[in-house]
């Protein structure tokens, strides 16, 4: 008898979409029940999004362990919890462990919360999932969800928070801090939301502020592109933060040169110091090279400062690595130029897409 394959066929995704149960069962004439996707995750059919209930039942009856782990230790129920699929309920009925964590200590409830699946969170709570279980970072499902939540997820986040707190999760000061970050994220991107969506998110944020005792975030005031650009901060760092909130759009380039020099230095700072230069490319280099040009516009910086900016830029290598203080000084020079040029200067064509 020929040895069966340990990996699923490459077109298994397509077979799932078609949904022909007999064709799916036939896969296992040549594949082991434990056959996985052949990728790094080692996902069996039970881990797949959209796997038909009939196939799930058949595989388990044939002997496939309902709690078989993937590469990271995630069970099928764990994976389905991230998708928010009703397959979670079926797997539970078949013996799926609602508490079994992955190798990092994340339980199915952690994943349902982090992926903002309120219906799955409700089901897992009803079935006795430990709402206070902590992963290796010491996060409960609630804290984990708040940590990764952006403003766009405020509505399901509020629903999940109410359920978990009602189930016995203790509120901590750290949670209030996370809620304020969620509020700031939404305010920064508010213009990208429809009026109806804004109302929904505002309502959800109000709930979150009240639940966690967090300070409500003030609505963002965006520069009109015409009025003089004025700041109140007494230090350049305070002024930089003011200018960022005032001039930077949620996506794409700024409308004014003033906004763009602030945006460029901020984007480069984030890519180098937070992201380690992983996405560094020609666009980032072109952004940097535009700074001395902008610093020479309008009421220009001194020749010494413009030359300094060129030297600083040259110290950022081709992998996006820079000496300490280089980006900080460029940010400071950007603020200095904006202060010298309060009247908005429209941004022309650019040769980058970051």
Language model features with spans:
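N-terminal segments that cap or nucleate solenoid repeat domains
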Residues: 2-49, 54-59
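Ankyrin-repeat boundary/"N-cap" motif
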Residues: 5-12, 35-48, 69-80, 101-107, ...
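Ankyrin repeat A-helix N-terminal signature
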Residues: 14-19, 44-52, 79-85, 111-117, ...
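Ankyrin repeat domain, specifically the short helix-to-loop turn at the C-terminus of the second helix
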Residues: 25-33, 57-65, 89-97, 122-130, ...
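A structural signal for the main folded, soluble domain(s) of proteins
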Residues: 69, 78, 82, 87, ...
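Internal alpha-helical scaffold/solenoid segments in large eukaryotic proteins
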Residues: 93-134, 139
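Ankyrin repeat (ANK) tandem arrays and their immediately adjacent linkers/low-complexity segments
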Residues: 134-354
